[in-house]
Structure formats: C-alpha cells, structure tokens
Amino acid sequence: MKRTSNRNEEATAKLSSSTTITTTTTNKYYNMANAEKSSKSTTISNLIPKYSLFNEPNNDNDTNSSTRPNKQQKLLKSNESTTSTTTTTTPITTTTTTTTTTTTPNLSKYYNYNLYIEKQNEKQNLPTTETETTTITPTLTTTTTTTTTTTTTTTKQIQNTTTSTINHFLPLIIQKEIIFLLVELGSFLNARKVCKYWKKVCNGCVENLNIYFTDIHLSASVKHVSEVFVKSLNSDYFHLQSVSFINGAKNSISYSEFYFNNVILPFIENVVRYNQTIENFTIKGFPITRINNKSSQQLLPSYKLYHSTSVPSSPPPPPPPPPPQIQQPTITAPTSTTAIAVSSTTTTATGQTLNNNNNNNNIPKGLNYYLTNNFKLKKINLKNIGLDSRDKFDFFSSLSSSVNNTLETLIICDNIGDEGMQLLSVILIKNLLKVLKRLELQKNQFTNQSAYYLNKVLSCEQLQLETLNLSSNRIDEQGLIMMKDGFGRNKSLKEFIFSKNRLGNTDSVDFGKSITSLDLHDSMVGSKQSIKGLSQYLKFNESITSLNLSFNHIGSNEAIKSLSKSFAVNQTLKFVDLSFNKINSNFGLDHLVSSLLINHSIHSISLQSNQIDNTSAITLSQLFNSSRQLFSPFKYLNLSGNKIGIGGLKKLINDLSKYSKTHIIYNNNDDNNNNKNENENKSKIKNLSFNNNNNNFVKIIKNYHDTIPIIRTINNSNGKNLLEEEVEQVINSSSNDTNQNDNINNENNLTEISIDLSSNSPLEVSKVIGLIPRYKSKLTFADRKPVKKYKLVKLLF
C-alpha cells in the first residue's frame, strides 16, 4: 500500500501531460479471483488482467481501484473509451491500441514481459513507466505487446468534452496485409505513405482485406487482437466489404494442433460471430473445425500437419455420440447403384440423418453455425477447407437449421463429392436459401450420381438460381442427359459453366431456353456428334449472348462448317471464343467468316493461338468491309498467338481510313532497346502530315499489359473512362470548327475497335505506323459541310 501510494503521489506531483503504462497480455491459466484477493500486496506492473472487448467504466473511488483489473463486459455495446480513477483528483481517460508482430522471440506461455522491460530499463537507466507520448502511428514492430496510453486532463476539460474518442487503428497483423495490398495495387508508392494516411485508408480506401496469419505464437495476445479487430469492424470501418482468411501454405498447416485450435480457429469464429457490417467472407486452406489427427481424420490426405514439441497439444475432444440408425426409404437413380433417400428426412451413406427443423439447441455453436446463421452475410466462399464425412453433415445441418433470406452467393470448392451434393440438394429443393442467385461447386469430384440431384435442383420452380458453376468435375454425357429435363423446366438460370468436364460424343445437347452465357471450355466438344448437337441447340436458342468453346480441338472442316451454320442463323450471340482450336484457312475459316458476314449480332470474337497466317488474315479482312461495318461494326478481334506478318496486317488495316483516331498499343519486352524504339516511333510520328481536313492522329502507348488494366478501371468525376476522355481531348484540340452543334463531343459517334496482334511474328511498330492510311472526310447532302465520324481503333502488339 505504501509503495503504490508513493507512486501515485509522484505521478500527481509531476503533472505530466500524458503517461504510458505497459502491461502484458494474460495467459489462459490466470485466475481473476486470486488476483483480486492478492491485489493489496501486488504492484501494478505484476498484475496481468484478462483482456475483454469492452471494459465498463469504473466509478469506484476506492484507493485500491488502480490495482484492480477492469470488470469484463462480454456483450457488444458502444465503443466508448474506458475511464478509471485513482487516489488523485485527476481523472484519466484511456484508449487501447494493439500491435502485433511479424517475428516474435521464442517465449513461453508464462513469460512476464514487464519484468523483462524493467530489467532492460535498469540497464539503460531509463524509467519503467513514465515516457513521453507522441502521435500514434502504425509501425511495423518486432515484438508482441499491448500498449495502453493514458492521457491526463483537468476536470474542467473532462466536463466540457461530451463525445468519446474513437479508435481508428487496426492491429498490426491486419495493418500489414492492408499495406501490402495497397502498395501492390499501386494506390501508394510505399508503406510510409500508407502509414501517413492511415485514417483515410481505413475509413475509405480499403474494401477487401486478406488475412494470412503469419508468425502467430502467443494465444492471449492474438485473442485480444481478434477482439479489437471485431470492435473496429463494427464501429469504424464501414467501407470494408470483404474479409478473407487465407492459408498461404495451401495444402499444409504450419501450426501445431494447439495453436490452430486455440488461436486461429477462435480468431475466425470471433470475426464471423460478432460481424455486423461485412457481407463477404472467404476461408481458403483452413479447416473450419477443430483438428486432432490422433482420434479422427479431419484433414484431407493432401494436408500436412506440423506438430510442435515446445507446446503441449490440446486433449482430444470426446467422441461424438453415434448417430441414430434410421431405416431409409429408397429412390433409385437411373445410373446409381446405391440407395438414395430424398424426403423430409435425408439419410447419408454413413447413416447420419439431416432433419429440417428450426430447433438450434442440438447444433454445436462453432464456426459452421456462425457462418451459416449470420444473416449479414451475402457471400460465403469456402475453398479447400478439408471436410470429411462428419464435417459435411455438421456444415449442411447448420445450413438447414433456419431459413436464410440474405445469402446470395455460395461457393464450395472442397471435394464434397456426391454425398455433399445430396445433402445440399435437400436444402435447395426446400428453398431454405430464399435469395440464392449464384452457386459455384467446382472441383468437387461430382459424378453422374450428383447429376441426378442437380436435375432435381434445376427442376425446382421456387429456386431462382441464375448462375451455376460445375467446372472441373467428372460429369460426362450421361450425366448431362440426366440434367436435360431440369434444364428444360428451369426458367431463371442465365449462366452455366461446364468447363473441364467430359461432354464426350453425344448429340443430345440442351441447356434450356433461358441461358445467356454458356462456358464449355475444355469439355471435349470437338467430336462430330457433340458439335452437331450443339449447333442444333444454337439454331433454336433465342437468349444466348456469350459462348466459350476454347480448348476443344474443333479444327476439323466439318465441325467448323456445322458450327458456322448455327452462327448464321442465331441472331442473339455477341461474343464467341474459339481460341486454341487449330483453325486456319484450310480448316473451316472460310465458312466461319461467311457466317459472320451474315450474322449482324456478333461483335467480338477470339481466335487466339490458332493457325492463322497471312493468307488467313486476308480472309478475315472481309469482316471490316463497308457492308459489315454498316450494320454492326466489330468491337474486338483477338488474333494473338498466331503467325500474321506485315502482309496480313496491311490487309487487315486497309479500311482504317474511316477512323480518325488510331491507338497502336504494343508490349516491348526488350528493356535494352526501349529508348531506341521510342526514338524511332517519335521520328515516324513527326513525318506524318497533320492537316486540318485530312489527318490521322496516332498515339503510341508502350507496355500495354501494364497500363491498360489501370486505365480501364479508373473513371473520372464525370463517369467517363479516362481513355475515352483522353481521346475526346485530342479530337477537340485538333478541330477548328466553332459550331456548338458539332458532333465531335457526341459520345455516340465515338466507337471502339480492338485488334489484338500480340505474340505474332515480329512486327515493327515503325512499319505499322507507315501502313496506316489517312483519314478521308465525307460530305453531307444537307449542308455540304465536312462531317467527321470520330472512332477509335486499337492495335495491340
């Protein structure tokens, strides 16, 4: 008592404007009751109070209140700063910030950090508690400590202050990921700029956040970090929309069982459980249940768990009670050899029963429950989370425990197999996910047995599913035939992704009448029968706008001819991808060009990495003639990865005299010749004539792959694309016409054509510029004045 009172008197006599008290985090074996009993004989530095998310203000005027730990407040309330009183009359307002580490020393659980600091200060002759306070800025430190900054003010200042301070600082483990993200995206030049504008960054700039859990060692400090993080999410950072928890090691968990079960998993659970603002959650590479390799196989064979000998592993949880054995009614699928139960009570192959009831008392409150019953979430993304048979049952039981009116996107990429598809189909058929629009089930090893359940899901009229992704599974033509009836009944599905499956040799192809986007990338559609069935489907479809047939080896003349006939009939397609199909002038290119001349709806086509040479380029040049451009001008033509030379390029750009603005965008990979090539291009530009009436403006943009994605994503205050605004400025500066009704500023007259010629045979930009013809003006019959149609052409090299 004397020692503590002397310290208080010294602190009052000095009347410093601010002091800093450093305390250590608690361990899980600390007893709060014993600490209160021995508080009279314990100094401030030796006390290790448990941290909580919110501390209640302590209004007790007892002289020993400064040595007592704050009361615990477990409920989420307001984010007011905590206040405490001492024997002096000066109130103290405390604000708590937390910093975590990138690398920490190997400390034991019972290590007292205060004793270590006091010894270091004694060696350096520094005071242990009194330091100057400066402006708090997030910095990358190398120790895991919790710093409490106390600011002393007068009683009059406290009475005049009515608003509480707000904590604008995230823990360092979160700050580090934001800094790396912002520097990588180019929003800031270096990490110092991010720290300087940290408040602005947290409040307005950050929308997506990835957390990798690197170098986590102390369980108590990480628990406190998660509490501070949850408080910050719900009180300050309203612009944050997505949080991702990612295992950087992919198929291995480089943490012991103790740390994963007591540090990482509780961190994720706290964020999901108390979430009030975040709409999108992603978990990639982490199991969503406790792991214990000795008692159960909860990790996939691809996972590798590294055990730590320095930390005792947690005792294995008691084994779950055996599930009730219920005799199942059977409905035999057409191609399945096992009994399948589809009723109000679903029994899986392991004998577990999935009931649809609203009683949540029997469901364990873990990450499964918090994910599926958090009605703030609109998107759940689970990839490679190591679900075994028991985990599948627990997850889908939690998902079926109540009706969800907020979840719009569900992504499960974790090899859930046919058993998981059976459990999910019961939930979808009963329409427990009322507003689900997007369902992605790629890489789940689905077979034709899953196609049977998918057919029932597609046949459900109450389910308003718009996007279905079944890529990278094992469904073949027989499974697609089983789903044919569901496609015919479904009226809401707009996008179907069936890439990397086994469509095989079948002419029975029908994806329904409501499909607008169809992706059959790398699905073995190159056979004569499958192309015949697909062509027949395209002829009678009146809704499809996008078709992806890349990597299907459709290089035969008969296959291209059959597909071209469907293009000539269909008048709704806008984008077609025929990349990597060995198409050339000898194998169907003439038929393809003829059909595109008849079809006036297709404005974008990709012929990347085929066998197109100069002869084929001459055939493709027919797409830019006057009649085709009059009805529906092309906007995009991808010819990259082919063998087009100067002769073919000259034929392709022969009709560029219609355009007044030409962008030649190329990618120069030779760093040593950058200056040389740039000087050559500038000299060629100077040699071009720029007259008032017949001119052709040329703009060179180097390194297309580095600049174009940024230009296309950033808009100005007027809502226009920066590239379009730049074009309009060049056009306006080159015109001498003072007529206010001129069509120069009309955006409808500014169209865009992109021709991608990258990765072809060497094409020198200086020669390409010389091939561009001049602009030819046209006269109108009404006023006999020249009218310019300002259009944009982009040649990509």
From Swiss-Prot:
LRR repeat residue intervals: 376-397, 406-425, 435-456, 464-484, 492-513, 514-535, 543-564, 572-593, 601-622, 633-653
The organism's place on the tree of life at top rank: Eukaryota
Biased composition annotated in UniProt, kind: Polar residues: 55-81
Which stretches does UniProt call biased (Low complexity)?
82-103
Q: What else is known?
A: Several proteins derive from AAC-rich mRNA, which, due to a frameshift also have ACA and CAA codons and thus are Asn-, Thr- or Gln-rich.
The UniProt annotation puts the region (Disordered) at 1-20, 51-103, 125-148, 307-333
What lineage, starting at the top, does this entry show?
A: Eukaryota, Amoebozoa, Evosea, Eumycetozoa, Dictyostelia
**Locations of Basic and acidic residues compositional bias?**
1-12
What's in the keyword line of the UniProt record? Leucine-rich repeat, Repeat
Return the Pfam families for the record.
LRR_6
Q: Where is the signal peptide?
A: none
Designated name of the protein: Leucine-rich repeat-containing protein AAC1
Biased composition annotated in UniProt, kind: Pro residues: 313-326
Q: Which SMART domains match?
A: LRR_RI
